[in-house]
Amino acid sequence: MNGLELSRAFYEAYGAPMLHEQFPEMERLVAVGLIGSGSECLGFDDEVSRDHDFEPGFCLLLPDEGAADRRTAFLLERAYAKLPKEFMGLKRSAIAPVGGARHGVLRMADFFTEKVGAPDGVLTVDQWLKLPQQALLEATGGELFRDDLGEVTAIRAALKAMPEDVRKKRLAGHLLLMAQAGQYNYLRCLKHGEPAAAQLAVNEFVKSCMEVVFLLNRTYAPYYKWSFRALRRLPKLALTAETLEYLLTTGNDEELAESKYDMIESTAADIIDELQNQGLTKAICGDLEKHAYSVNDGIEDGDVRNLNILYTV
């Protein structure tokens, strides 16, 4: 049983009855689920994950004080704290993890302010441009078990829909970094006798390539620890995971370097094919830099288009 399944089972066994019996007037106002930080919200938790922050628990998200006053929130917190301390052989933690409590009673506005800087999830263009994909994933990942009002569901749905101009700006910046690091600087660093710098170039190529692949899939990239696991599950370009892993985990002697450069070019070609499939580029070549500027040229908002191409990276 993974964390999401554990959370739902704990809620159904104890949380739902607690709400129904002790807070019947709040049942339709409270959104319940497991959302926010943690591998369990992504379905990536495994046996290793159980050594920290793994416990039966769920989130109770309250509307503003006009609908749920402070006293009600306090009573709900106290009732949640009194739920069984152990469930299915797993104990609930008595202390909050680093970064604050992940379960229990939260205000909707506080949750979304912490994750994306907006209590209602309505972001400015600049916020969209600057927010890390991980922050957007934490705001939209996990699962809601109940949301009668639909308010949290609506906010999460809006945050999943990155504006197209923003997606293009992010793509353009990372495509340019892929070109600089992989297609241009990798072999040049080796010719300069700088193998460590060459590996840094590989790292930059891989990091930006992963950002591009998630953007092309219209989904958000997770914390780097889970990036490869998430990459392998994507519907498009999932096979790049194997190539990128090889680039990161092999050396840079002369024979390997030529092979790795061929892989960089092959990966670039796959990315370009998908850019063309989505109508994002008008360039016709294998140079990712030219495609980066073509993607940027396709941004409709002149203010966003005219920002430095690396503004989002």
Predicted region positions:
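Helical scaffold of the NTase/Pol beta-like nucleotidyltransferase catalytic core
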Residues: 1-33
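Basic, alpha-helical terminal appendages of large translation-related enzymes
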Residues: 1-2, 67-68, 264
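Hydrophobic, Leu/Ile/Phe/Ala-enriched alpha-helical segments that form helix-helix packing faces
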Residues: 15-23, 76-84, 271, 275
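Ligand-binding pocket scaffold of soluble enzyme catalytic domains
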Residues: 42-46, 57-59, 86-90, 194, ...
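A generic structural motif
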Residues: 62-67, 192-196
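Conserved nucleotidyltransferase catalytic core and NTase-mimicking acidic/glycine-rich helix/loop elements
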Residues: 134-305, 310-313
